[in-house]
Curated annotation (Swiss-Prot):
Pathway: Purine metabolism; IMP biosynthesis via de novo pathway; N(1)-(5-phospho-D-ribosyl)glycinamide from 5-phospho-alpha-D-ribose 1-diphosphate: step 2/2. Its EC number is 6.3.4.13. ATP binds at residues 134-190. SUPFAM superfamilies: Glutathione synthetase ATP-binding domain-like, PreATP-grasp domain, Rudiment single hybrid motif. HAMAP family: GARS (MF_00138). Belongs to the GARS family. SMART domains: GARS_A (SM01209), GARS_C (SM01210). It comes from the Bacteria. One of its GO terms (molecular function) is ATP binding. Residues 108-310 form the ATP-grasp domain. This is Phosphoribosylamine--glycine ligase. Gene3D superfamilies: 3.40.50.20, ATP-grasp fold, A domain, ATP-grasp fold, B domain, Phosphoribosylglycinamide synthetase, C-terminal domain. Its cofactor is Mg(2+); Mn(2+).
Length: 413
């Protein structure tokens, strides 16, 4: 079997690595991939992930059996539909179903209609309307841009001044939809769920992401500065409740409304005093949650995808070890940052997943905001954390930073 991974980040590096381990897979390709994937996949960086026709031509020319789409943009732009219409199997939803990530408003309206627990919300359609709303709304307030924003389109405002600044920041133009949400307090967690129509199978291991740029959850939101799994202080009963009240109902709601979803639904949830509630949905694996979950997963991912396609029972096997991933990012991220700084001290092995590196001559240099995820495994989260930071410290660069508290919530509970 030949499998093509679409995407260039750490999530796709982890997907390629995991698919490459499958005994039923003969060859893995990556478009555009990155320079760190060359040991596990045939990398075709000459094709852009936005060039859907070229991806289709490549898949047909190379007799690709399955395409796994990693990032959100190609899903929302309809790559899965194009490939499926050419009778190529795809793990990832079509454009219509990918709206669950592509539009915050679509997701909120669906949850509202089907009474899926989430924060109360208000929709506004212009900068002026938003500025008026924040003059009198309850605080704190969460401000979300309706479309995609690479994990950086969310502002939490604790003061009236912050709320006004947030609106001005999100509204670069006068018109556009923004969703205001009441602020939810509690412990956040990420639940990946396999979905095929109304058949939904959540992973029975959750992960916890760290969205803020700096220690102690300070600074702006990012795409994710680290993650770990399992989450020992959130017990199995919470997972069961999340499945019953969120995962199953949202799959059924999507099917009922005619939005045919096949792929991975990411449920970003928060455990409040009233139980789990939805913060966001994504139409694909989280990054960096994918890297830690796929490191811990012992099951054959390709076989699980085929079982999902056939609506067969899915059983997950996990390593006993905990996994912690620490993201090293370019200084300045999630704002502006310099590229082209040399980065060394790491091997292309299972201790690292690469997001934003490229090879220039014999050296690797940074080419993105999030650069490389250092992985640690151990019998406890604490031991896995120590190993992850040991691997992070081995990386040499004058232009990287990382958080020092990834996994602390599991250790201090």
């Amino acid at each position: 079997m030949k499998v093509l991974i679409v995407g260039a980040g750490g999530r796709e590096h982890a997907l390629a690595s995991k698919i490459n381990q499958s005994p039923i897979v003969d060859k893995v390709y990556a478009i555009p991939g990155n320079d760190a994937m060359v040991n596990i996949a045939e990398v075709h960086s000459e094709i852009a992930e936005s060039d859907h026709q070229a991806i289709l031509h490549f898949a047909q020319h190379n007799a690709i059996d399955w395409v796994i789409i990693g990032p959100e943009q190609p899903l929302i732009d309809g790559l899965a539909d194009l490939l499926r219409n050419a009778n190529i199997k795809v793990f990832g939803p079509g454009q219509d179903a990918a709206q669950i990530e592509g539009s915050k408003l679509f997701a909120k309206q669906l949850m509202d209609k089907y009474r899926i627990p989430t924060a109360e919300y208000k929709e506004v359609s212009s900068r002026n309307e938003a500025l008026q709303y924040v003059e009198t709304c309850d605080l704190p307030i969460v401000i979300k841009k309706d479309g995609l924003a690479a994990g950086k389109g969310v502002i939490i405002a604790f003061t009236r001044e912050d709320a006004l600044d947030g609106v001005k920041k999100i509204y670069q133009e006068e018109k556009g939809k923004v969703v205001f949400e009441s602020y939810l307090e509690g412990e956040e967690f990420s639940l990946m769920t396999f979905v095929n129509g109304d058949y939904a199978v959540p992973f029975d291991c959750i992960a916890q992401d760290h969205k803020r740029a700096f220690d102690n959850d300070q600074g702006p939101n990012t795409g994710g500065m680290g993650a770990y799994c399992p989450v020992p202080h959130i017990d199995a009963s919470v997972l069961e409740q999340t499945n019953k009240e969120i995962a199953q109902p949202i799959a059924k709601a999507m099917a009922q409304e005619g939005h045919d979803f096949f792929g991975l639904l990411y449920i970003g949830a928060i455990l409040t005093k009233d139980g789990p509630k939805v913060i966001e949905f994504n139409a694909r694996f989280g990054d960096p949650e994918a890297q830690v979950l796929l490191t811990r997963l012992e099951s054959d991912l390709m076989q699980l995808i085929i079982d999902l396609e056939n609506c067969q029972p899915i059983h997950f096997n996990w390593k006993d070890e905990a996994v912690v991933g620490v993201m090293l990012a370019s200084k300045g991220y999630p704002g502006s940052y310099e590229k082209g700084h040399e980065i060394s001290g790491f091997n292309l092995d299972s201790h690292y997943y690469v997001s934003g590196l490229k090879k220039e001559g014999q050296c690797f240099v940074n080419s993105g905001g999030r650069v490389i995820l250092a992985i640690g495994e151990g019998p406890t989260v604490e031991k896995a954390q120590a190993n992850a930071y040991e691997h992070a410290r081995q990386i040499k660069s004058d232009n990287l930073f990382y958080r020092n508290d990834i996994g602390n919530k599991a250790i201090t509970k």
